[in-house]
Structure formats: C-alpha cells, structure tokens
From Swiss-Prot:
Its EC number is 2.1.1.166. One of its GO terms (molecular function) is rRNA (uridine-2'-O-)-methyltransferase activity. PANTHER family: RIBOSOMAL RNA METHYLTRANSFERASE, RRNA METHYLTRANSFERASE 2, MITOCHONDRIAL. Belongs to the class I-like SAM-binding methyltransferase superfamily. RNA methyltransferase RlmE family. It is found in: Cytoplasm. It holds the Pfam family FtsJ. It is an enzyme of class 2 (transferase). Keywords: Cytoplasm, Methyltransferase, rRNA processing, S-adenosyl-L-methionine, Transferase. NCBIfam families: PRK11188.1. The active site is at residue 161. This is Ribosomal RNA large subunit methyltransferase E.
Amino acid sequence: MPRSKSSHRWLKEHFDDEYVKRAQQEGYRSRAVYKLQEIQERDRLLRQGMTVVDLGAAPGGWTQYAAGLVGKHGRVVASDILPMDPLPGVTIVEGDFREAEVLERLLAVLGEGGADLVMSDMAPNMSGMDAVDQPRAMYLAELAAELARTVLKPGGDFLVKLFQGAEFDEYVRMLRTEYDKVSIRKPKASRPRSREVYAVARGRKVV
C-alpha cells in the first residue's frame, strides 16, 4: 500500500528531528526522554531513592531516565500493554492495569510503601479526528489520575500528558483540588504543532 503524503511528511520530520538523532546518539529508547529531562530540570520531580511508577512506559525512554536518577536505592515500576525490553533496576508489569490481575501485580510490586511519583506519557493511537482523539486522550489521563489516587503516598507527585481541548480545563481543575500545586509545561521537545502539554501536580493532598 503506498504511503500517504501525511505519512511521508511524518517520516521525514521524524528522521530529521534533532531529538530523534540525540536519542540515538545518547542510547535512549525514544525522543520522549527529552521532554521529561526538561521538566526535571525545571521541577526536580525525580530524586535519589524514590519509588516511581511509569505508565505507558514502552519503549522505555522515560523509564531509562528515571532509573538513572533514582539510583540503586530507588526503584522504577514500568507499566504498559506493550512488551518492553528489560532495563537494569526496573520492574516491568506488562498488561492493561484496568484489569484486576494486572493491577494486583502492580500493587504487589509496590507493596505497602506506595509511590513517590506517578508519571504517565500515555496517548491514544491518533486518528486525526479531534472528536475521537480528545476523548480517548482524556480517558487515559483519567485512568492515570485514578491510579495515582490509589498508589501515591501523601505529598507525592503526579506528571501526566494532556492534550489541550475538550475537558482539559475540567481535568486541571480536578488536579488542583487533589494536589497542592499544579503547573502546565510545554517542553521544547514536544512538537510545536502538537496540542500536547504536561501537567505537573505536586503534593498529593491527604483526603
């Protein structure tokens, strides 16, 4: 099947992308690592000894970066419905955490201590139709927020990918009721024409 003009354009942009080239040169699994790196430089979410849950982790760029910063006394639990190659010091929970068995495995790995940080870079497969894509994206963000409610320690932090559009404002308002401080970040590595942003929610409130 011949490729469409849009897919040709995407491929050209992908291989010309400075962040794709950097990721290849620096041994990271995806360009997405530079979004997290920029957020980290500004917000200092990741620290030595932390327990981190990474949702939508495959292929593992964020997981790699987080594991390097939490160090040998910290741990990263990576969750995705897609298979993911192992990484040193990382526990991978493969499967859909909406399913009870997968969620139980995830909770068992974390134990009673819970998590200091939940990160979600989850996004739906985009159709190009906003009326379809935006509800799917917000649904994934809701799932991530619900998991954060379950596993975060009091005072813990939550980082989540969002797309500006329907339900965005309501979601951010919800975060502000549950966390002490919420900021919106648009990393330079996020493609300019994308409506993708990240919400940084600090200090999970005790309910």
